[in-house]
Amino acid sequence: MSVPCEVAVKCVLPVVRAMVAKELMANYGLRQVDAAHVLCVSQPAISLYSRNIRGKAIHLENDQQIQDLISSLAKSLAEGNTSRRNIVLTYCEICRTIRAKGLLCRLHKAFDPLVEIEKCELCVDSKSVRCV
């Protein structure tokens, strides 16, 4: 049995990091090595993100609410004016939003065939996604 947070760590977090990395480089002029430092990942990981080789398990670019959260996170990281706690909370907010919108369901089903997407309300129930 896999739980939604496990799927999020394996599939969603790399997508979010890829989106943030691209925004840091495109909008804030960071080089790959600088974006890697800010995101606490390796420069080769950033290279894979920028070439769409890693971080493509779920398509989030067309969701304006998620894109706004990503942009806010990228801005905070680029400016370096926010606490680690707030960065973590923003990551969690992005994940909760993705889960609440039902965007994780098909991935969860791929990890655990016993998940009944049509009946499951775990992620869309606002009380169940209070991880932080």
Give the predicted meaning of each segment.
Residues 1-17:
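Short, Lys/Arg-enriched anionic-surface-contact patches
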Residues 53-54:
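C-terminal flanking helix
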Residues 57-74:
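Short Lys/Arg-enriched helix C-cap and helix-to-coil transition segments
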